[in-house]
Amino acid sequence: MNVSVVTERRTPAYSSLAAGELNGLVARALLTEARLTPKPGLVDIRNSGAHRDMDLAAFERSTTAIAPWMEKFFIMGNNTAALAAENVLVMLRPLGMACENDMLQATNGVNTHRRAIFAFGLLSAAIGRLLARGEPLEQNRICDQVARLSRNIVAHELSAKKAGKLTKSETHFQCYGLSGARGEAESGFRTVRTQALPVFNRVVQEHDDTHLALLQTLLHLMAWNDDTNLVSRGGLEGLYYVQQQAQKLLWQGGVLVEGGIEAMQSLDDELILRNLSPGGSADLLAVTWFLSHFPAGSLYPE
């Protein structure tokens, strides 16, 4: 089965962004990722991946519910720009919880976008801070602000010893050293900046095809991202299996060679059988698409 998806051409880089525009850009990022097909183990147009409790329609409803909240994250970041970044995270949390509640109402209690709310809430607040300070909207500046907002979040939330049963995130960190979405945010989306964006930009430049670029980028993320969603479903064995299979496809050329799309579909079928879904990599793919709409800027912003 060949699946053909038409994706929009990249828009010009943003030099400025109004709060209302941000809602639309985040919604497009989430929908672009959700509709990208084929995605091994993930919800897409072809199937629901390794998920029995959600489908593409649920992701679309969820996106409609959470996108309007990005403006609120933006405004909070804008209004608190004079404060030290590490003091703002506590103010963003109630917005995140309210946004998550709207998501759950839209999906009848299914968690479709919890990690995405965390990532895009921070990105939206970071953009608000930069604009309040009169600084340019550049990938590295935005990600630097996210890192500042998230400073010490891993130490505070994952490594501290607490009474009672550990959460999944605490277990992943304390047993395996995997910091998940929190670690990626605290690093300023290092995986996105150093691995995903370079691949995406190269494929777009060489092939003028956003669809192929996103699929190839997803393969790179699956190959190298320590996706805790895979650990939750299949332990370290599941994580390593997906990484090895993605690396194998990349060595063969990924989706850029004849038969590449069919190989992705075969991997999709295999991950469904194994109940493995690289949801963390899917979230980073949406972040990649989002950040690609801004110029890279200086590697070490002041």
From Swiss-Prot:
The keyword Transferase applies. Disulfide bonds: none annotated. Its EC number is 2.4.2.52. GO terms for biological process: prosthetic group biosynthetic process. Keywords: ATP-binding, Nucleotide-binding, Transferase. Gene3D superfamilies: Triphosphoribosyl-dephospho-CoA protein (1.10.4200.10). One of its GO terms (molecular function) is triphosphoribosyl-dephospho-CoA synthase activity. The keyword Translocase does not apply. It catalyses: 3'-dephospho-CoA + ATP = 2'-(5''-triphospho-alpha-D-ribosyl)-3'-dephospho-CoA + adenine. It is an enzyme of class 2 (transferase). PANTHER family: 2-(5''-TRIPHOSPHORIBOSYL)-3'-DEPHOSPHOCOENZYME-A SYNTHASE, TRIPHOSPHORIBOSYL-DEPHOSPHO-COA SYNTHASE. Belongs to the CitG/MdcB family. This is Probable 2-(5''-triphosphoribosyl)-3'-dephosphocoenzyme-A synthase 1. The gene is citG1.
